[in-house]
From Swiss-Prot:
Keywords: Glycoprotein, Host cytoplasm, Host nucleus, Secreted, Signal, Virulence. One of its GO terms (cellular component) is extracellular region. It comes from Plasmopara viticola. This is Secreted RxLR effector protein 81. Has the canonical translocation RxLR motif, but lacks the canonical EER motif, which characterizes most oomycete effectors identified so far.
Length: 111
């Protein structure tokens, strides 16, 4: 089995990695406020936008706007259950802070 690792660190502190490009493992996107998982297929189909752009962070945000991406985000609440599922859609919130916001529907969020 070929074992390789992809790690991209963006200027705003967001990192993108995958344990193995040869398997069905999912990409993991980390920012200061969230951890996102999505399939390699959905990312690689538009990866050329990242490679060909001098401003990789902006290109990645454009990619996220174009694609519906499944992800997992950690959260907890003292008043509610520690774990719940919510359907959301990812939207980059701030390039400066590396934060991500969620909007609409399409992604499972779980504690």
């Amino acid at each position: 089995m070929l074992v390789s690792m992809l790690l991209i660190i963006f200027p705003n502190g967001v990192s993108l990695s995958t344990p193995s490009l040869s398997s069905r493992n999912k990409f993991i996107l980390r920012s200061r406020s969230s951890r996102l998982r999505f399939s390699a297929r959905s990312f690689l189909s538009s990866a050329s936008r990242l490679v060909n752009s001098s401003k990789m962070t902006l290109a990645f945000e454009r990619l996220l706007r174009l694609r519906r991406v499944s992800f997992t985000k950690k959260f907890s609440s003292s008043d509610e259950d520690k774990s719940r599922d919510v359907r959301r859609r990812l939207r980059p919130a701030s390039e400066a802070t590396g934060a991500f916001a969620v909007r609409g529907a399409d992604c499972a969020i779980a504690d």
